[in-house]
Amino acid sequence: RQTILYGLKGISAYGHQARELGYYSDEADDFYILALEALTDDRLSVEELIRLTMRTGEMAIEVMKKLDEANTAIYQNPAPQKVNVHLKKGPFIIVSGHDLKDLEMLLKQTEGTGIHIYTHGEMLPCHGYPGLNKYPHLAGNFGGAWQDQQKQFDNLPGCILMTTNCLMRPRDSYKDRIYSTNVVGWDGVKHIGKNENGEKDFSAIIEQALELGGYPEDQDVQEILVGFGHHATLGYADAIVDAVKSGKLRHFFLIG
């Protein structure tokens, strides 16, 4: 039952993100309700619960497909892209979480302001999407894993926008410059919601980022390569197979 519940949490998270972009799966939605009901049904046998667990996995894949369809239909298929992981001088906003639509809205509203936008954590893959990396002020990625955010956000001379997922208790050193949006939030943290048209006004975080000013000097450029989604990777399939056969490629590492 716990495994099913964990699976449903993932299904709801990815399903919500897809729905924010206008995509959803009736099959996954119907299963979600049935599975929630089954979690409280003590009449189910172990065999029935195992079958339900396997079905949960199938629906997780289904909703991931739907989210991938949404992301690629709107922002195009990811392609390899170099990303600077150090900060430039000037005002900046760091965007963390999962919601590509929030990132896009912020990029549009900060055009021409001189503000650099940096991804953080699981936003890093956004740099591979042509529909997002077309914005020149999407300047790079900041920091590492989400669990290090309290240390990495400490005393930053810029603002942070937390979209869905991975917000930890903010320290006092940056609580006045961190904002939340979508389904994430924290007591005392400024929240940016939708208007009646489904749009968001990011003027408050933009104004504060300009006031803070950012760093006075550029940091040395250090780049990493992202954008190898399944579509891009399959484009190199023949070269990968040849490298394996020749012994040039001997190890594959699964992360996540």
Describe the predicted segments one by one.
Residues R1-G256:
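Metallocofactor- and cofactor-centric catalytic cores in central/energy metabolism, strongly enriched
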